[in-house]
């Protein structure tokens, strides 16, 4: 599926907790309703990023795995 994103966060090569910490900062800078694509290689993001979205009220639009790379599309909640 193709999504038109407003920002990209490349957390490739980073391990827990860095991807989620970076995600928190990136989402803070995103406009409400904005779409963020996250690229990660840490398998723990499969657990951590969906929980992050539920906890903070953001929408996890889609997630995919491609050869050890994890892709997430997150829509920031409206203020």
UniProtKB/Swiss-Prot annotation:
What positions does UniProt annotate as the active site of this protein?
A: 16
Q: Which GO terms describe its cellular component?
A: cytoplasm
> Which BP terms does GO give this entry?
tRNA wobble position uridine thiolation
The source's superkingdom equals Bacteria
Instruction: Report if keyword Cytoplasm is assigned.
Output: yes
| Protein localization | Cytoplasm
Keywords in alphabetical order, please: Cytoplasm
Known function:
Sulfur carrier protein which probably makes part of a sulfur-relay system.
Xref: NCBIfam families: PRK00299.1 (NF001423)
Can you name this protein? Sulfur carrier protein TusA
Q: Which gene encodes it?
A: tusA
């Amino acid at each position: 599926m193709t999504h038109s994103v407003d920002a990209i966060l490349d957390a490739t090569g980073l391990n827990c907790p860095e991807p989620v910490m970076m995600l928190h900062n990136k989402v803070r800078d995103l406009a409400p309703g904005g779409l963020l694509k996250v690229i990660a290689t840490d398998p723990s993001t499969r657990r951590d990023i969906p929980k992050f979205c539920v906890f903070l009220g953001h929408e996890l639009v889609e997630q995919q795995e491609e050869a050890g790379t994890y892709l997430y599309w997150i829509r920031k909640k409206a203020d």
